[in-house]
């Protein structure tokens, strides 16, 4: 399912170096343009792929979305009702909803999209597991029947897997669907104006978007920048409106009016490939996790308030779940040394080719070296890291995950036997059984206990080594307002942005 994006031949190069004059041109034309960045390129614009999920919230629209205050609000749907038993959701679509080519958005577009996710064996098909049946009652009515009451279901409809696609476009594009942003149609706030692989893209306000009156900007210019210092320099020169900060820069900027922080729910963790002989033994995996100081790492390398993690379900995703579990630090150098010192392990660890990943990789590499473990770091673009993980071609891999919906299972389900994102060869029948029991448990307190037991078992098995829960420190132009950040689903929304250039 993971397809590589291609740039249309007619697409102009977006980045001609750092000496761009775009902001000045924006003012001349009285065009309101947000200038921002991403640290990695798009992988696909096919919602069934859903890996680069940030883009989907900008170009597509699901039944519901999170607004600027992180409240669930109607989107492509104008309203919904739920049956008394909590198992049937009926959505009434916005009659004004259109695709970017002017054709109406219909219930059949959603029904077909859901069916396609399953038929194409999308790695995200498991997100449709609660759904028993989807029916397009008429053009503006979609009925979704669930296997069981699912209290968090509405939040699931904000994610890419639940977004509509047009069957005629999919059939016309065939295997290339999602690889060229310019040949697709979109029902969200923005459409693609330009795309240049590994350099960036420009989004333009969708003239057919039903809620276009509330989209206050004309374009979003997104550059692909992997060097945080370059991003800061571009921010300082007025060529970026938003730039992330690393630990070296937080102290410099923390008292400035452009300085901002946001606590999100993205978890970073190390996958441990149990198919590798060196990592089959649970004690070895536990020793690797115990060998590095997560607290010192987050304070010295990140310095932005990110939390050291000895858990995989992020804090504050569900306060009730937080109350149902206990978290203990796993850091124990002496215990790690007893297991690792005489093994003379040689391991390869995959990291992405951004500055933060490299620093974390080097920190863990250094800590394990002290325990006589030789770790070779392999720095790769995100797409290549994912491909290596998918093939099982690694020992350790620094990965991350943000919640697709507002429930602990958005993390815990990843590690069940057979889940496409369980790329470590991990399988525990008791773990699977606990999650299956939680699936059918209607008493929410009992359900949370089952889930917390599953998390404890996963961590005791050391299928993964949790590293940290991210907090973002970033610079944002004070002329830019309402750049919404989310801790569930996609990270960010451009829809609500307002710009007043001075």
What is the meaning of each model-derived region?
Residues 275, 279-317, 359-360, 455-463:
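Periplasmic-binding protein-like
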Residues 208-251:
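Ligand-site clamp/hinge motif
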Residues 50, 159-215, 219:
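Gly/Pro-rich hinge or "lid" segments in bacterial periplasmic/extracellular proteins
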Residues 303-341, 356:
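Structural transition elements
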Residues 37-82, 115, 185:
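N-terminal lobe/hinge region of extracytoplasmic solute-binding protein
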Residues 376, 381-385, 413-479, 502:
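Extracytoplasmic/peripheral linker and loop segments enriched in polar/acidic and small residues
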Residues 81, 126-170, 194:
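Surface-exposed binding/hinge segments that line
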Residues 474-502:
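Long beta-strand-rich cores associated with HINT superfamily self-processing modules
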């Amino acid at each position: 399912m993971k397809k590589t994006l291609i740039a249309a031949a007619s697409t102009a190069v977006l980045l001609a170096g750092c000496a761009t004059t775009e902001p000045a041109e924006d003012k001349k034309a009285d065009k309101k343009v947000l200038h921002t960045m991403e640290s990695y390129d798009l992988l696909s614009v096919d919602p069934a792929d859903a890996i680069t999920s940030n883009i989907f919230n900008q170009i597509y629209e699901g039944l519901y979305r999170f607004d600027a205050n992180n409240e669930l609000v109607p989107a492509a749907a104008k309203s919904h009702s739920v049956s008394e038993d909590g198992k049937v959701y009926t959505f009434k679509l916005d009659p004004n909803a259109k695709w970017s080519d002017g054709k109406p958005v219909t219930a059949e577009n959603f029904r077909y999209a859901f069916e396609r996710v399953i038929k194409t064996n999308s790695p995200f098909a498991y997100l449709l597991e609660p759904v028993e049946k989807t029916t397009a009652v008429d053009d503006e009515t979609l009925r979704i029947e669930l296997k069981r009451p699912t209290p968090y279901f509405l939040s699931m409809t904000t994610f890419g897997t639940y977004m509509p696609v047009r069957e005629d476009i999919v059939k016309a594009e065939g295997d290339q669907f999602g690889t060229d942003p310019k040949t697709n149609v979109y029902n969200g706030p923005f459409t693609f104006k330009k795309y240049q692989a590994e350099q960036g893209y420009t989004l333009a306000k969708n003239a057919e978007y039903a809620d276009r009156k509330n989209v206050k900007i004309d374009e979003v210019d997104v550059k692909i920048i992997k060097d945080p210092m370059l991003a800061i320099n571009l921010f300082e020169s007025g060529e970026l409106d938003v730039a992330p900060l690393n630990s070296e820069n937080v102290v410099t900027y923390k008292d400035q009016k452009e300085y901002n922080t946001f606590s999100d729910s993205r978890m970073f963790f190390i996958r441990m490939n149990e198919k590798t002989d060196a990592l089959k033994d649970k004690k070895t995996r536990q020793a690797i996790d115990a060998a590095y100081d997560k607290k010192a790492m987050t304070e010295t390398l990140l310095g932005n308030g990110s939390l050291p993690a000895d858990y995989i379900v992020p804090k504050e995703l569900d306060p009730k779940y937080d109350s149902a579990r206990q978290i203990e630090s796993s850091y124990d150098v002496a215990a790690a040394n007893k297991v690792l010192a005489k093994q003379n392990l040689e391991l390869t660890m995959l990291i992405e080719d951004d500055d933060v990943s490299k620093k974390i990789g080097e920190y863990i590499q250094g800590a394990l070296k002290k325990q006589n473990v030789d770790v070779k770091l392999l720095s790769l673009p995100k797409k290549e890291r994912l491909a290596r993980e998918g093939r099982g071609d690694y020992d350790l891999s620094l990965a991350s995950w943000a919640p697709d919906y507002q429930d602990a299972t958005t993390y815990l389900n990843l590690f069940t036997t057979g889940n496409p994102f369980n790329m470590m060869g991990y399988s525990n029948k008791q773990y699977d059984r606990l999650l299956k029991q939680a699936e059918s448990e209607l008493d929410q307190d009992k359900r949370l206990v089952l889930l917390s037991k599953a998390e404890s078992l996963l961590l005791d098995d050391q299928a993964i080594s949790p590293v940290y829960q991210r907090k973002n420190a970033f610079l944002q132009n004070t002329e830019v307002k309402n750049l919404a950040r989310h801790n569930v689903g996609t990270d960010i929304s451009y829809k609500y942005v307002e710009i007043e250039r001075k």
